Amino acid sequence: MSQDFYLGNPNLKKVGTEIQFTKDQIAEYLKCKEDPVYFAMTYIKIISLDEGIVPFKMWDFQQELIESFHENRFNIAKLPRQTGKSTTCVSYLLHYILFNDNVNVGILANKLSTARDLLGRLQLAYEQLPMWLQQGIVVYNKGSMELENGSKILAASTSASAVRGMSFNIIFLDEFAFIPNHIAEQFFSSVYPTITSGTSTKVIIISTPNGMNHFYKLWVDAQKGRNGYAWNEVHWSKVPGRDAKWKETTIANTSERQFTQEFECEFLGSVDTLITASKLRVLTYDDAITTNGSLDVYENPIPNHDYIICVDVSRGLAQDYSAFVVIDITHAPWRLVAKYRDKDVRLYPYILLLVSMVHV
């Protein structure tokens, strides 16, 4: 029977293998296709540190996450450490490539090794599926996987070059808050348009907070309805076995600040910032009323108002950014009314002169 297996692996079905389905299997297949939560609870298996390979016994919040992924195009979730978030996401991605033909999924993380580890978890779960639920294997390695139904899944780092030119039906971004701001910005500018061009494509962003960065902005915008992301958050106490005693022990073994960020999921600013994190969190920001390239304008110039422009220029060699902000100082509190940020302009860009003529 080894001829029915992919490269002799008895846990993987070979392309072209015929399966004689029973009536019960057909009904079960259709049930799994329609309900990703049922599929995960019934057929996904994971590795337990104590018991080896065991069924994935989902907690309520994990079921809610999968339902949100299934029902919404754009998802962002803020979760504590060690809540099974990776296994939950992998379960949904496996369901997606199994029951949808000719789709591409990208598993992306701040490190290539992390993305490949996630793909490895998906492959482990795949090998535990019964043969009648599997698709035949076309490609199966540490970095990618392709099924007989034409669906593919790729593990890569979140660099613009890693996935440039590719099209994805789902992009899963793991621990997005730990990706440097400039890399996240480049990544979205190169890959995000391919997602938004579709009508059923999805973005899933999962992370524990790591300061007040790009993930923080996406999260706040989602909560305030400024973007199209459905948002989910999980408190550490929702994980069985985590109580006040567990919290006390964890803080004793780490620190109060570490617990607050990694388990309470608070967005903490750096201790070295000029403005305190508590103040940064209460500051408001609005969408620009006009945008022209790298220039965002939040208020049009008002006659007889006083403005200042703060400028920080670079060499214009596509490395550091040239930037300036325009601030209305007529009345307290002062307001930022325009900003500019670009790394491809020459020293003392002409746009600075134009903005100065309007506001000063």
List PLM regions with ranges.
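Nucleic-acid-processing active sites and adjacent nucleic-acid-binding tracks
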Residues: 147, 293, 303, 318, ...
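ATPase catalytic-site recognition across NTP-hydrolyzing enzymes
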Residues: 186, 237-313
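Pre-P-loop entry segment of helicase/translocase ATPase cores
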Residues: 1-74
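Walker A/P-loop
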Residues: 72-93
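Inter-Walker segment of RecA-like/P-loop motor cores
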Residues: 118-169
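Conserved Walker A/P-loop ATP-binding site and its immediately adjacent core
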Residues: 103-124
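ASCE P-loop NTPase helicase motor core
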Residues: 124-128, 134, 178-254
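Conserved Walker B
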Residues: 175-179, 314
